[in-house]
């Protein structure tokens, strides 16, 4: 009896980091009790495809939740969750960071032709397994080493399967407008639908930019590009301390980064 109650379809968590917590506890009570019935993974990192280095790094850096990794591809990971038994539905983008680490590692370098081909083939594989498209998080290492051209090339493959490109853009602050332009360029050049993760303008100096962001998106949509955004339902944000560190400090992966942090000048 739903008299005097509001009835709604299940909510979609477009940016879920339940990739590990669902392994530990598939009941997902924290989201289920808020009405979330679909968890979408893949903001930059996805739990597949995994090469040996990625698998070892995930195992090495596990926190309180410990688990074995008996999968390689993204499809195998999602199948693992399904067979384990979880309350929510799940879906995932292919992490652009995950693709880059598979082919290039953690270095600040442009992928050569063979490395780019590896990334493209992994996109083909992931999309055939049911991935939603490509997800990027360009404010974090090693994602911020990716060029616009690199992202266009891998998005072209996802577009062949009617996938989407979704991005935590390079900047949500002083270079917000330029970052929106980059996303629109990727969408146009790759012929792909695109969405901006958690659209915001960080820093008081940038609060006046939202109208121009909306104008850019409206203009792109009027020209035929399929662009959408999502937003928080609150006026706060949080991230890790790594987001405030320059790219050269983080180059080469976590071990080299930690070694550099021992330098008092840093």
Enumerate the language-model features and the residues they cover.
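Histidine-rich, glycine-flanked metal-binding segment
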Residues: 1-10, 25
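Conserved beta-strand termini and adjacent loop/short-helix elements that scaffold enzyme active sites
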Residues: 2-3, 93, 197-199
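Divalent metal-coordination and catalytic microenvironments
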Residues: 4, 15, 35, 90, ...
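Short, basic, glycine/proline-bearing loop/turn elements
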Residues: 8-16, 198-203
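Histidine-centered catalytic micro-motifs
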Residues: 10-21, 165-171
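Acidic, glycine-rich active-site loops and adjacent beta-strand->loop/helix elements
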Residues: 17-20, 44-47, 171-173, 200-202
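Divalent-metal coordination cores built from histidine and acidic residues
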Residues: 24-132, 225-227
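Histidine/acidic residue-rich metal-binding segments in metalloenzymes
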Residues: 76-77, 110-136, 142-266
């Amino acid at each position: 009896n739903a008299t005097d109650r509001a009835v709604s379809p299940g909510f979609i968590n477009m940016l879920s980091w339940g990739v590990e917590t669902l392994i530990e506890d598939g009941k997902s009570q924290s989201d289920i009790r808020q009405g979330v019935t679909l968890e979408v993974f893949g903001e930059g990192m996805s739990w597949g495809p995994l090469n040996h280095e990625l698998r070892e790094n995930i195992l090495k850096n596990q926190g309180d939740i410990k688990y074995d990794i008996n999968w390689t591809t993204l499809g195998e990971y999602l199948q693992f969750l399904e067979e384990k038994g979880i309350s929510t539905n799940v879906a995932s983008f292919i992490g652009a960071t995950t693709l880059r680490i598979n082919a290039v590692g953690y270095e600040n370098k442009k992928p050569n032709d063979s490395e780019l081909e590896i990334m493209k083939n992994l996109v083909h594989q992931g999309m055939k397994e049911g991935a939603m498209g490509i997800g990027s998080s360009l404010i974090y290492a090693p994602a911020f080493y990716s060029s616009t051209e690199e992202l266009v090339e891998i998005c072209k493959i996802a577009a062949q399967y009617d996938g989407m490109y979704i991005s935590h853009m390079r900047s949500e602050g002083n270079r917000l407008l330029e970052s929106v332009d980059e996303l629109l360029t990727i969408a146009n050049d790759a012929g792909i639908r695109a969405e901006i993760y958690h659209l915001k303008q960080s820093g008081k100096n940038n609060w006046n930019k939202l109208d121009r962001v909306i104008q850019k998106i409206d203009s792109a949509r009027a020209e035929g590009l399929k662009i959408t955004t999502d937003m928080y339902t609150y006026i706060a944000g949080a991230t890790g301390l790594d987001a405030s560190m320059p790219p050269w400090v983080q180059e080469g992966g976590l071990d080299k980064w930690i070694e550099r942090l021992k330098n008092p000048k840093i």
